[in-house]
Amino acid sequence: MQNKIILLLTLCFLNTYLLANSDKTLKDIAPYPLPTDSQKRYVIHLPTESNEEKLKVELQATKNAMKDCNRVWFGGKLETKTLEGWGYNYYIIDQVSDQPASTMMACPGIKATIKPVSVFLGDETFLRYNSKLPIVVYAPKEVELHYVIWHQNDIINSAKEG
């Protein structure tokens, strides 16, 4: 009987400890690959929300470049990979152009300065919101990653037949 009480108390303390220290590191979740020497790895832990099916996460990447009054952007590619044996997705930002594309307007009196410039990643930047798994993204070292959480409002419009 005394052993059962000790076991029960141990389990209670262990459960309290685990709940208090629930911030899991990435290696506690799954064996995601380490970044290469030319990459950095971003890990986004999303908070639990009540209606996650109404949310989306948009990934946005930037890279520093000279910018004046012209529209400037870099090309790039967002590739989805699956963690073998686990089935979890992770993402790789790749093929980021060395030189930005730009409109060619004259900018009299405007001096170009170094600013963060968008990296166009294609049409796959909207991801399903899932607070149970982190979003893991590998990017070149010169690229910064940002994200936006999009909320669907409660108004659903009907399309008209025509």
Curated annotation (Swiss-Prot):
Transmembrane spans: none
InterPro entries for this protein: Ecotin_sf, Prot_inh_ecotin
SUPFAM superfamilies: Ecotin, trypsin inhibitor
Secretion signal span: none
Single GO MF descriptor: serine-type endopeptidase inhibitor activity
Family (UniProt): Belongs to the protease inhibitor I11 (ecotin) family.
Protein name (Swiss-Prot/TrEMBL): Ecotin-like protein
Species in which this protein is naturally found: Rickettsia felis (strain ATCC VR-1525 / URRWXCal2) (Rickettsia azadi)
